[in-house]
Every structure is written in C-alpha cells, then in structure tokens.
Amino acid sequence: MSSIHDPRYKNLIKELIKIRELKNITQVELATSLKKPQSYIAKVENLDRRIDVIELHDWLSALDKSISDFLASCFEK
C-alpha cells in the first residue's frame, strides 16, 4: 500500500482540512500565504499529491498551529 493511501495519512490530511475550515481560511488564502497556487492545496487535500514534512511545517505555520501538537493529536487516536 502506498503511503498516500495509508489510513493514517488520510487522517492527517482530514485534520489539516478541519483546521483550515475551522479558521475560515479558504484554499486560495492558504495558498497565497504559502506562495503556492491554489491547485497545490487542492491536490494535497484531495490526496492527489503527497506533502512532505517541510511542507507540513509550513502549512501548519500558516494556520498558526504547532507541528508537534498537530502530530500528537493525529496519532493519539
């Protein structure tokens, strides 16, 4: 099984989406703060593109969330 289809990875992406939506941040706004096109956000959220740890850190920083807290909450379930 490729890691993009791993249930843990899918949960991680669901949590990223949840945080973004709870903060009322659109894909366009997040992409702008990351200096990426909106399609980058859409591809990650639709599981068409894998996100690496540096990108995850930048993504969470843009959402004002700590990577350590985020990972702890994703994997404690």
Regions found by a protein language model. Name each.
Residues 21, 35, 46-48, 75:
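Residue-level detection of the helix-turn-helix DNA-binding "recognition helix"
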Residues 24-43:
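Short alpha-helical DNA-recognition segment
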Residues 1-22:
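A short, Lys/Arg-rich alpha-helix, primarily the initiator
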Residues 1-7, 69-77:
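Short, charged recognition helix plus adjacent turn
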Residues 14, 24-25, 51-54:
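Residue-level signal for the short linker/turn that defines the boundary of a DNA-recognition helix
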Residues 21, 32, 61:
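Alpha-helical residues within the helix-turn-helix
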Residues 54-69:
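DNA major-groove recognition helix of helix-turn-helix/homeodomain DNA-binding modules
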